[in-house]
């Protein structure tokens, strides 16, 4: 079996709705292929959740038809955060969990990602086995063996109670005023309840999904509205989730953004203070140098993984560590969850705020972020602009200008048709100009 994946990217199968492979016919066959592979493993039961995109209705119907044809039973949760599906997959002893979501992408994109029975991303060999089944003609099981579909009516309540259980029982959020931005996504009916039930005064925004407004000028990918609201309401802090609830970005009382690097730093430092830190912290190639330096000053080990929460998880398991993060807001806390969980990560930071009696602003000052600029260049997928001589020359010139006080990273996105250009260093103006210089060279060679 070839190890070259044709459909599965770093976060499942993803694309524009109506364009291959995110079409009803392909998703039906994907459900059947996955069902064929998973049916060999035991319970023949699958949990299916989705975010709030309008296309979710179409895709879950197609997916369920394929699974049923392979003899698997599907249990629908309705709109549900990605980490909630991972949790429910474990608690229901299901064979797998499936999430219909394109995470932080616009509403016209969608995707399918799978969790194993342990609530983790599917192993490579299972993904490859599913791809191999996709090459075959669909064959239904006998009529008596066809799968059935049911709905789990209390999924939200179960997950809310789980999230609350990760917050120290001796602490309360009673003194905090929090603005919660749910990105008009999957956390809209969950996150406000979690923080309210723990005592916080919650102001909710991004909680009116209509199928097309997910991630639109709200949520973790665009915190401007949250920053403004936190200041206007004189709130203690703000929380921004992405469309499927696996990313968290925070905002302090002054309206300053607190990203995934800073969140992981705060959680690690608090664990160290309590004597509960197990090992070090895993970041990625995009992790700010300021985080690496801040952790080193505390004596906390740090290593970088490739970009993508899948690779952060792999490195955590390899090292036996418990805390991993991406600056985009994926925070993985393996002593509490099996995948990136934005609500659980937020609760750990809030526990630090309450326990230390320090503001989020004060806690985040423990590390100094280097200026970092990220430019995204549209890329149709033809050729490889990263190999162009003009691009290589631009990178060499920028690296010479930055010297030992900065770095450059160019990579293809694993989830979108983009080339990402990241430049980081001590001199903010130089970093900005350098990023634009490289981005222009990439554009000229796309």
From Swiss-Prot:
Its EC number is 5.4.2.10. The active site is at residue 103. GO terms for cellular component: cytosol. Activated by phosphorylation. The lineage of its organism: Bacteria, Pseudomonadati, Pseudomonadota, Gammaproteobacteria, Vibrionales. Keywords: Isomerase, Magnesium, Metal-binding, Phosphoprotein. Binds 1 Mg(2+) ion per subunit. InterPro entries: A-D-PHexomutase_a/b/a-I, A-D-PHexomutase_a/b/a-I/II/III, A-D-PHexomutase_a/b/a-II, A-D-PHexomutase_a/b/a-III, A-D-PHexomutase_C, A-D-PHexomutase_C_sf, A-D-PHexomutase_CS, Alpha-D-phosphohexomutase_SF. It comes from the Bacteria. The modification Phosphoserine is found at residue 103. It catalyses: alpha-D-glucosamine 1-phosphate = D-glucosamine 6-phosphate. One of its GO terms (biological process) is peptidoglycan biosynthetic process. Belongs to the phosphohexose mutase family. It is an enzyme of class 5 (isomerase). Catalyzes the conversion of glucosamine-6-phosphate to glucosamine-1-phosphate. Gene3D superfamilies: Alpha-D-Glucose-1,6-Bisphosphate, subunit A, domain 3, Alpha-D-phosphohexomutase, C-terminal domain. Signal peptide: none annotated. One of its GO terms (molecular function) is phosphomannomutase activity. This is Phosphoglucosamine mutase. Its cofactor is Mg(2+). Mg(2+) binds at residues 103, 242, 244, 246.
């Amino acid at each position: 079996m070839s190890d070259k994946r044709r459909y599965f990217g770093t976060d499942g199968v993803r694309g524009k709705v109506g364009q291959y492979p995110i079409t009803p016919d392909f998703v039906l066959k994907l459900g059947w292929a996955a069902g064929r592979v998973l049916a060999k493993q035991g319970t023949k039961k699958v949990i299916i959740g989705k975010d709030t995109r309008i296309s979710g209705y179409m895709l879950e119907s197609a997916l369920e038809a394929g699974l049923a044809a392979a003899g698997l039973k599907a249990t629908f949760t309705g709109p549900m955060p990605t980490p909630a599906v991972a949790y429910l997959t474990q608690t229901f002893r299901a064979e797998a969990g499936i999430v219909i979501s394109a995470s932080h992408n616009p509403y016209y994109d969608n995707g399918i990602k799978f969790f194993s029975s342990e609530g983790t991303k599917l192993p490579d060999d299972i993904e490859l086995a599913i791809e191999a089944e996709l090459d075959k003609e669909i064959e239904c099981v006998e009529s008596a063996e066809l799968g059935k579909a049911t709905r789990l009516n209390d999924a939200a309540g179960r997950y809310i109670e789980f999230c609350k259980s990760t917050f120290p029982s001796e602490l309360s959020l009673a003194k905090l005023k929090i603005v919660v931005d749910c990105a008009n996504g999957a956390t809209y009916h969950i996150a406000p309840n979690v923080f309210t039930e723990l005592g916080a005064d919650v102001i909710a925004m991004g909680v009116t999904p209509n199928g097309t407004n997910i991630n639109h000028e709200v949520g973790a990918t665009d915190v401007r509205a949250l920053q403004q609201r936190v200041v206007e309401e004189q709130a203690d802090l703000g929380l921004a989730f992405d469309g499927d609830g696996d990313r968290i970005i925070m905002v302090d009382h002054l309206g300053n953004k607190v990203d995934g690097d800073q969140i992981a730093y705060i959680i690690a430092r608090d664990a160290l203070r309590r004597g509960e830190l197990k090992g070090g912290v895993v970041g990625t190639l995009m992790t700010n140098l300021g985080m690496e330096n801040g952790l080193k000053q505390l004596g906390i080990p740090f290593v970088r993984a490739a970009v993508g929460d899948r690779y952060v998880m792999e490195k955590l398991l390899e090292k036996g560590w418990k805390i991993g993060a991406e600056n985009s807001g994926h925070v993985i806390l393996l002593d509490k969850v099996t995948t990136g969980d934005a609500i659980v990560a937020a609760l750990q930071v809030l526990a630090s705020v309450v326990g230390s009696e320090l503001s989020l602003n004060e806690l985040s000052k423990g590390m100094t972020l280097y200026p970092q600029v990220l430019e995204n260049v549209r890329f149709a997928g033809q050729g490889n602009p990263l190999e162009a001589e003009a691009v290589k020359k631009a990178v060499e010139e920028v690296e010479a200008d930055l010297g030992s006080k900065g770095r450059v990273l160019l990579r293809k996105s694993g989830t979108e048709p983009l080339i990402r250009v990241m430049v980081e260093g001590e001199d903010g103006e130089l970093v900005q100009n350098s990023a634009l210089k490289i981005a222009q060279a990439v554009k000229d060679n796309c």
